[in-house]
């Protein structure tokens, strides 16, 4: 539309367990380069539970202390990472503030040159956090070594501030030499090419440049398929930006471009064909009148057209697991603040609902539904309900009841239930990894930079640099292996791998079991000049098959072999 903070998070099962039947009734201006506007997510109040018939005596609670407004060093995030002399630097500042919306809270950054930048604090990002972001605000060309940036929190008079001294923060920042960078290094540039219906923008030295012919073919086929599926007559070529690192879930879009992560270190569940179809649908849905429709309709349409969320699936069968469980989100809840709900459940329900609606009223009916639901300023819930009535299906409550009966006829198996539960646990574990090792990539906490604006400004670092610590690479390898086991329905093995990742997120190395083995394999590979991006455990052969990038011939792909010696040390040999 996402490296510095450390948050140890243990992720448990999402809780797809039977419960009672679900109810069906129920940024400020900154002087900096332009960025992608995120979807507007307006917070709404959650209805309170109905009061008990009998009066109850509620003990007096201790008042919650009002937090002292402050700027804290661990709540100032600086991108890209690692920070290299010559970078265009972004600041993400999350001040400590009392509860409430304050229109006049500002943060001022004083750069080493004396230049001052001021931004207003407001709710930004999918986590709806009160923050201020300064995008590509500090040009570090000509600088090097240690620098001091000063931040000041400016408060309106009505904010109680018992300790004003912590409203000013001096932040030391070290600009490292470009020699610190692993390949593809500092010389990366944007390049462009065209195929039928698409215009591809890629980064030199990237996996996308290496695989460009295959990507062009896939993009052209996806564009033709989506245009045919939506009966779109739009002829304008779509701008697709191929990123060389994972951001968000692997793809995001604006009205005139699509960004897709095309990487070797593919720990996120990003299938190129499905990402292309999903994001192309967002680009073309304006022709159906969906560009102002409730997010539930827009995301549901994209999931339906792609044929799944992360990989191909029967959306109705997967969604049929949810009714009667704690994980199910009633449609009247889901339609409001769509992006604030559990990500996989929200997208799955939305996609399955659109499959049902197309079956009931056809694609033209869905188009009409979108147009009607886009027509006024009421809440998303009211707009969707009114549009459903006009389509002849009944209001939102009635449609949900009919949809649930439709899903109920599918009778998913216990294996399908376990697989969905594990899929969600895998994605939540991935996000826990991002929060701890790659914050900018986390779609809720991080930043989804505009590649279009970056290309215009000749900025590449935010789309290339991913975590280079051995620990981060090892955890990504385990996540990718868990994903592969999950897709092959080896659920026991996938669950064990996720447990290894969760354990490693709780503790510093040395880790236990397989996590430590993979970490040692990564270190041994890096010492030989190879960066692993995939591993396969080969217990019968007593070792690991390693897929790695050759740092001396980037981004050439190699195969290595790792096995323990007589002392238990991992030895890497090859290429094979």
Describe the role of every protein-language-model region.
Residues 1-5:
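Sec-dependent bacterial lipoprotein signal peptides
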Residues 13-18, 37-38, 44-75, 83, ...:
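Beta/coil-rich, acidic/histidine-enriched accessory regions frequently appended to metallopeptidases
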Residues 187-294, 309-312, 319-321, 325-328, ...:
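Juxtacatalytic substrate-recognition/specificity segment
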């Amino acid at each position: 539309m996402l490296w510095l903070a450390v948050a140890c998070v243990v992720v448990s099962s999402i809780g797809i367990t039977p419960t009672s039947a679900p109810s069906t009734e129920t940024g400020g201006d900154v002087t900096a380069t332009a960025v992608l506007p995120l979807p507007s997510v307006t917070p709404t109040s959650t209805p309170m539970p109905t009061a008990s018939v009998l009066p109850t005596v509620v003990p007096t609670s201790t008042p919650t202390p009002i937090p002292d407004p402050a700027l804290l060093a661990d709540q100032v995030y600086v991108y890209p990472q690692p920070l290299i002399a010559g970078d265009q630097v972004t600041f993400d500042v999350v001040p400590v503030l009392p509860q409430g919306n304050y229109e006049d809270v500002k943060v001022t950054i004083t750069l080493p040159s004396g230049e001052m930048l001021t931004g207003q604090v407001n709710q930004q990002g999918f986590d709806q956090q009160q923050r201020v972001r300064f995008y590509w605000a500090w040009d570090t060309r000509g600088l090097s070594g240690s620098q001091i940036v000063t931040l000041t929190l400016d408060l309106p008079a009505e904010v109680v501030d018992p300790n004003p001294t912590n409203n000013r923060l001096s932040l030391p920042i070290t600009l490292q030499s470009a020699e610190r960078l692993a390949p593809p290094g500092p010389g990366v540039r944007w390049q462009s090419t065209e195929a039928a219906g698409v215009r591809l923008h890629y980064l030199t030295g990237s996996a996308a440049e290496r695989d460009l012919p295959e990507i062009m073919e896939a993009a052209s086929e996806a564009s033709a398929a989506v245009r045919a599926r939506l009966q779109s007559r739009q002829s304008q070529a779509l701008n697709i930006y191929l990123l060389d690192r994972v951001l968000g879930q692997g793809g995001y879009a604006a009205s005139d471009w699509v960004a897709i992560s095309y990487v070797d270190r593919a720990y996120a569940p990003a299938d190129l064909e499905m990402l292309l179809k999903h994001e192309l649908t967002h680009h073309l849905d304006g022709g159906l009148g969906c560009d102002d429709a409730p997010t539930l309709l827009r995301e549901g349409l994209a999931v339906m057209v792609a044929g799944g969320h992360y990989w191909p699936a029967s959306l109705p069968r997967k969604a049929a697991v949810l009714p009667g469980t704690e994980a199910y989100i009633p449609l009247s809840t889901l339609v409001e603040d769509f992006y604030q709900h559990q990500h996989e459940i929200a997208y799955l329900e939305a996609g399955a609902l659109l499959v049902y609606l197309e079956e009931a009223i056809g694609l033209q009916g869905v188009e009409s539904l979108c147009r009607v639901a886009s027509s006024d300023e009421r809440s998303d819930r009211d707009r969707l309900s009114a549009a459903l009535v006009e389509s002849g299906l009944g209001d939102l409550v009635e449609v949900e009841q009919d949809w649930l009966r439709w899903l109920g006829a599918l009778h998913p198996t216990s294996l399908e239930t376990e697989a969905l539960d594990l899929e969600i646990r895998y994605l939540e574990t991935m996000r826990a990894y991002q929060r701890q090792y790659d914050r900018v990539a986390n779609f809720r906490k991080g930043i989804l930079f505009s590649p279009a604006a970056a290309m215009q400004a000749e900025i590449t670092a935010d789309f290339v640099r991913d975590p280079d610590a051995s620990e981060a690479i090892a955890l990504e390898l385990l996540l990718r292996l868990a994903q592969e086991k999950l897709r092959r329905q080896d659920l026991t093995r996938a669950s064990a791998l996720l447990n290894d990742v969760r354990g490693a997120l709780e503790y510093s190395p040395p880790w236990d079991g397989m996590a430590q083995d993979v970490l040692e394999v990564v270190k041994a590979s890096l010492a030989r000049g190879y960066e692993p991006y995939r591993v396969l455990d080969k217990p019968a052969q007593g070792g690991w098959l390693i897929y790695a990038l050759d740092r001396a011939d980037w981004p050439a792909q190699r195969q290595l072999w790792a096995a323990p010696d007589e002392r238990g040390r991992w030895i890497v040999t090859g290429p094979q």
